[in-house]
Regions:
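N-terminal cap/lid segment of alpha/beta-hydrolase-fold proteins
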Residues: 9-52
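Short substrate-entry loop that stabilizes the transition state in hydrolases
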Residues: 53-56, 61-96
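Alpha/beta-hydrolase active-site loop
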Residues: 101-125
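Hydrolase active-site cap/lid region
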Residues: 140-187, 245
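Short beta-strand/loop motif that positions the catalytic acidic residue
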Residues: 201-202, 208-210, 214
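Acidic catalytic loop of the alpha/beta-hydrolase fold
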Residues: 212-217, 243
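Short alpha-helix in the alpha/beta-hydrolase fold that links the catalytic acid
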Residues: 218-226
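C-terminal catalytic histidine-bearing segment of alpha/beta-hydrolase fold enzymes
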Residues: 227-260
Length: 260
């Protein structure tokens, strides 16, 4: 895992934040910001913070998919902010269909984006020892990697992701595009498998949520990842689909993140 830590690290940890817009609504403050993830990547993000109360937590809320999915989690971020957390939703993009080298590069950039987002949280007032990460689907994939390489995290939530997911989805994508599945591709997907990363000892508490009716990531894959994970960990399973977006699911995540 030392190689993974080097791959997902930067020599410098300073971050500069630019605010392009700000407004207040329903007891929270909304900001549109940009920051640098590395020397060549400028990231757009939404930051939601409490209005008129002390910040008790900092949380990154990472969307799934390969494009900007912040809109699916804005209400959840607002609810956590109303509970005392400052929440950042950074945009990440990954390209699983563009070959191994490009995919590895975009995964690295996405992980560096999430790590820089933690720096932004601290810069904007989050207590450094309270940092949390929540990731849905592909965002959960990033959360699994961060479990192994980001020591600042106090709590991690991974929902709707599991062991073997990257291998299954990337190979299916390759075949659907008419490309051959090579041994190099299989080895690369195996190296990035989530179960490998969550098995590393860490201080962060880990919550894994999964829906039994998830057609994208079978519940068995989520359970396999949970079984591989190091302690401390918690498993919550629901009679639901891939989204895990009901109020109960959101409340369980918020309770885990916001608990003192």
């Amino acid at each position: 895992m030392a190689g993974a830590r080097r791959f997902f690290d930067l020599a410098t940890r300073s971050v500069s934040v630019s605010v392009s817009g700000e407004h207040e609504h329903a007891g929270v403050v909304w900001r549109e910001v940009t920051f640098a993830a590395d020397s060549s990547t400028v990231v757009t993000a939404t930051v939601v913070s409490p209005l008129g109360q002390r910040v008790t937590r900092g949380a990154v809320l990472a969307h799934g998919g390969t494009e900007d999915g912040r809109r699916f989690f804005l209400s959840e971020a607002a609810a956590m902010a109303a509970g005392g957390a400052i929440v950042i939703l950074p945009v990440t993009r990954m390209r699983p269909q563009d070959g191994i080298d490009m995919f590895a590069a975009t995964v690295r950039t996405a992980v560096l984006t999430e790590r820089a987002a933690l720096d932004v949280l601290v810069e904007m007032g989050a207590p450094p020892d309270t940092l949390c990460f929540l990731g849905h689907s592909a965002g959960g994939f990033l959360g699994a990697i961060l479990a192994a390489v980001e020591p600042r995290l106090a709590r991690i939530v991974i929902f709707s992701y599991g062991a073997g997911t990257l291998i299954r989805t990337s190979l299916a994508t390759t075949l659907s595009c008419g490309g051959p599945v090579t041994n190099e591709m299989t080895c690369a997907a195996d190296w990035f498998d989530a179960a490998r990363f969550v098995a590393v000892d860490r201080r962060a508490e880990l919550l894994i949520q999964h829906g039994r009716r998830d057609r994208d990531v079978p519940a068995e894959a989520g359970r396999e990842m949970f079984d591989a994970a190091a302690q401390p960990k918690l498993w919550l399973e629901y009679d639901w689909d891939h989204g895990l977006a009901s109020q109960r699911h959101k409340d369980d995540r918020a309770k885990f993140v916001l608990k003192l």
